[in-house]
Curated annotation (Swiss-Prot):
It comes from Streptococcus suis (strain 05ZYH33). One of its GO terms (biological process) is negative regulation of DNA-templated transcription. Residues 49-139 form the ATP-cone domain. Its cofactor is Zn(2+). Residues 1-22 are annotated as: Disordered. A zinc finger (unnamed) spans 3-34. This is Transcriptional repressor NrdR. The keyword ATP-binding applies. The gene is nrdR. PROSITE patterns: ATP_CONE (PS51161). Negatively regulates transcription of bacterial ribonucleotide reductase nrd genes and operons by binding to NrdR-boxes. Keywords: ATP-binding, DNA-binding, Metal-binding, Nucleotide-binding, Repressor, Transcription, Transcription regulation, Zinc, Zinc-finger. InterPro entries: ATP-cone_dom, NrdR-like_N, RNR_NrdR-like. Belongs to the NrdR family. The keyword Kinase does not apply.
Amino acid sequence: MRCPKCQSLKSSVIDSRQAEDGNTIRRRRSCDQCGQRFTTYERIEEKTLVVVKKDGTREQFSREKIFNGIIRSAQKRPVSTDDIDEVVNRIEQKVRAQGDSEIESDVIGNLVMEELVELDEITYVRFASVYRSFKDVGELENLLKQMISKGSKVKPGKKDETK
């Protein structure tokens, strides 16, 4: 593993443990040349997954793109990056469990919305307003009315513990 400080390819593993998600190994390393300590993560190489967008174009699945979209929606909300990472892990697991090499972007968007409504309703509304491309305030108002009629199940920033 290349040292981020001196670029040496020689390093020693100091500590190795399984990450919380169970699919990743976290390794603490020390560069044999300069002594710099750094962390690496090892995960199973998944088969390539292609997302089919609304306009028919295709691009490689990116968990970072989902993570960044949720981060933007959760700005100034009591939602931790660990919570968001857990959401992205669950979404990726559901997408890969389908076993297909291609998935529609709408399916991913709906999975994100299912997760966000349980995590934080404001984050959900922010994400939905961009994802669904609301054309006016009336469409947003309809979404809010639907949420109110279903009853608020969660408190902001908390997961629903009743499930």
